[in-house]
C-alpha cells in the first residue's frame, strides 16, 4: 500500500511538471495544489495579462524569465499562471477556471500575485510590478515566507 501511494504521488507530481513545460508555470490550479501538497511547498500564483499588460510583461522579462528566480522557484515554490490574454487562444476549460479564480481572489488589477498554502489559503499578496530584478524579488519572497 505504501509503495502504491508513493507511485500515485509520483505520477501526480510528474504530470503536473509535464503541464508546466519549460517555464515552470502551471496553468491547472487543482494540479498545482496537488503538487504543492506532495512537495510540501507553497503556491505562487500570478494573475496576469501576458499579451497586453505592460507591467506583467515587464515582470516576466525582468524577473520571472531570469535564471536566479527560476532556480529559487524550482526548489521552493509551485508556480501558477492565471492568464487573461486578449489575443492568445485558451481552451474553454482554462478560461472558466481563470474566471473562477479571478472572482475567488477578487482581482482588481494586473499583475496580482499571491503566496498560498497547499490548500489554496492566501498567505500574502502583492499587486503591481516590484522593481529590483530577480535577486530583490527572491529576497522579498523569502521574507514573505518567513511570516
Give residue spans per PLM region.
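Sec/Tat signal peptide C-region and signal peptidase I cleavage site
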Residues: 16-22
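Typically the conserved alpha-helix immediately C-terminal to a functionally engaged Cys/Sec
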Residues: 55-72
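Thiol-based oxidoreductase modules, predominantly thioredoxin-like and allied folds used
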Residues: 25-26, 69-95
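Bacterial N-terminal signal peptides
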Residues: 7-15
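Short active-site neighborhood of thiol/selenol oxidoreductases, capturing the structured segment around
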Residues: 40-53
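A short beta-strand-turn-helix
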Residues: 25-43, 73
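Positively charged n-region of N-terminal signal peptides that target proteins for export
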Residues: 1-5
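Non-catalytic, surface beta->alpha helical segment in thiol-disulfide oxidoreductase systems
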Residues: 62, 104, 108-147
